[in-house]
Amino acid sequence: AFLWDTGVLVSRVEDVLCNGGRNILMLNVSFACHMPDCLEMPYKPAIIGMHDPIGKEVRWYMGGNSCLAGDYVGCWSFDERHWPKPGDLVVFRDMIHYTMVKTTMFNGVTHPSIVIYHPEEDRFEVIRRFGYEDYKHRMG
């Protein structure tokens, strides 16, 4: 990539669980489908409101929504004492440089929409929304 900090990937918490002593946020995005660079190389994106754990802070792993067993990345801690709940947003920084060019629709997982934020008007403009037809056309 020749540009950094070019865009964010906004995800939503679908479920909060603890498995084998690990706190996991199940998200509506997939590392395997939307952020493959996080699995293929040692790239750990920054998350707004979170940081690398220090000492005995509560650690959170992020789980993706595909059926791939390894569709998770971790771990982070919240900047403030916070116990997340379904519906909360998790915003990954600096994700657009690979998110849009290396994505897959593995098992029909939808691509994230492309949206531009216009801060002077405090509004979002949807440039492209992906759906089933996009998946179907990729299958041939």
Functional labels for PLM-detected ranges:
Residues 1-140:
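Charged (often Lys/Glu-rich) extended helix/loop segments that serve as interaction or gating elements
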